[in-house]
Amino acid sequence: MSGGLDVLQMKEEDVLKFLAAGTHLGGTNLDFQMEQYIYKRKSDGIYIINLKRTWEKLLLAARAIVAIENPADVCVISSRNTGQRAVLKFASASGATPIAGRFTPGTFTNQIQAAFREPRLLVVTDPRADHQPLTEASYVNIPTIALCNTDSPLRYVDIAIPCNNKGAHSVGLMWWMLAREVLRMRGTISREHPWEVMPDLYFYRDPEEIEKEEQAAAEKATTKEEYQGEWTAPVAEFPQAEVADWSEGVQVPSVPIQQFPAERPEIPAAKPAAEDWSSQPASTDDWSAAPTAQASEWTGTTTEWS
């Protein structure tokens, strides 16, 4: 299906991704219409899918999606939890219309209900789980693409992509590969450079695991804050701004500061001040005069008593 072009050939890094995600591992049961996509059977009864056929069908499905002029006319569906996140990511990347979760019967056939749609192409994750949209698509002549495992029924499926549609990593990787090929064929991204979007964003994550990771992150953050608080608490109790307040509250008597000359030869200049102090004996005479007068008065009284 690649036409012998080197550009469309499967790269080694793509094969490694397929093997790491377990895309080549099928089930223990085999549908007679899926025999053409089987490479070998393991000793434990698990069938191995031929990844070359997987890549060819992936390119064919991408060509069918690109052929639709309006991307919103492509409807991607996944009723299983493992493919809901991948379907939403694929829809945001390619512009398709997603239906994640339960498919309302009559969406393609009942024109009265509000959820009625008329897509031009239908892509499902599991033909067995998504049998209702496949059946309704056959009523209104909508071509269908499906990710099929070794035991998947191919009734009403036009393009079957053989892969492991049970594993969360395999389903996410297949939707990531399909989105990348669609964008490459549209010319949105180049084949020479790798796509910046990682396949991990298409993988299903268990809500319990997400909650555990959030709790672990919260506990780590609290312990880090407590550790930092033990060292920073004394600094917070005695800020530098409070030292100025203590100095303002204490009343310090104002004492004039005596300025001393810096050079010693200028010390004799203080002699005039000494002369000023010596000029005060005039006032001392006044003090000495008063006691003498009082003494004479007291002596006078004593003479009278005698």
Curated annotation (Swiss-Prot):
Q: Which Gene3D superfamilies match?
A: Glucose-6-phosphate isomerase like protein, domain 1
Q: How is it modified after translation?
A: Acylated. Acylation may be a prerequisite for conversion of the monomeric 37 kDa laminin receptor precursor (37LRP) to the mature dimeric 67 kDa laminin receptor (67LR), and may provide a mechanism for membrane association. Cleaved by stromelysin-3 (ST3) at the cell surface. Cleavage by stromelysin-3 may be a mechanism to alter cell-extracellular matrix interactions.
- UniProt lists compositionally biased (Polar residues) regions at 277-306
The [DE]-W-[ST] repeat units are at 230-232, 245-247, 276-278, 286-288, 304-306
Residue ranges, annotated region (Laminin-binding)? 161-180, 205-229, 242-306
Indicate whether Mitochondrion appears among the record's keywords: no
Recorded GO cellular component terms are:
cytosolic small ribosomal subunit; nucleus; plasma membrane
Q: Which GO terms describe its molecular function?
A: laminin binding; laminin receptor activity; structural constituent of ribosome
Q: Which UniProt keywords apply?
A: Acetylation, Cell membrane, Cytoplasm, Membrane, Nucleus, Receptor, Repeat, Ribonucleoprotein, Ribosomal protein
Residue(s) at site: Cleavage: A115, F116, P133, L134
Q: Which HAMAP family match?
A: Ribosomal_S2_euk (MF_03015), Ribosomal_S2_laminin_receptor (MF_03016)
Family label: Belongs to the universal ribosomal protein uS2 family.
Q: Provide the function of this protein.
A: Required for the assembly and/or stability of the 40S ribosomal subunit. Required for the processing of the 20S rRNA-precursor to mature 18S rRNA in a late step of the maturation of 40S ribosomal subunits. Also functions as a cell surface receptor for laminin. Plays a role in cell adhesion to the basement membrane and in the consequent activation of signaling transduction pathways. May play a role in cell fate determination and tissue morphogenesis.
What name goes with this protein? Small ribosomal subunit protein uS2
Instruction: Tell me which species this is from.
Output: Xenopus tropicalis
